[in-house]
């Protein structure tokens, strides 16, 4: 089964680009690292709202690691040393969003929606299989279901 996404293009099982000259292979995305303004607010969002496990800290507690369960960490958040400009407007170079797979059914997505709404986070940018919220620093977080 293919899934129609934002465009008319179907989402097929990905295939690696052929490249005989490549001397290594990227197996998967390892983690995302973010600078944040408030580690307590960040913990509440990633741990308490999204349900990621807090797996450790580094640099005297200035970095917190969160895991979805397979790796030591999928997200690391480091306390910023200076205030930042906030989220980038859409369409300019920079991080657009981070997406988390929350299940395989629309019921799974509905549970995610109820959880973020209960935390006072208004979902936006919904598609039939996803929704978005902002973390405490304004990073766009997409929650989606993979309904292939």
Please identify what each model-predicted range represents.
Residues 1-23, 28-37, 86-148:
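Vicinal oxygen chelate
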Residues 18-21, 82-89:
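Short beta-strand/turn micro-motifs at beta-sheet edges
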Residues 23, 35-80:
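Core segments of cupin and vicinal oxygen chelate
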Residues 71, 103-105, 148:
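Short coil/turn motifs at secondary-structure junctions
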Residues 80-82, 146:
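Acetyl-CoA-dependent GNAT
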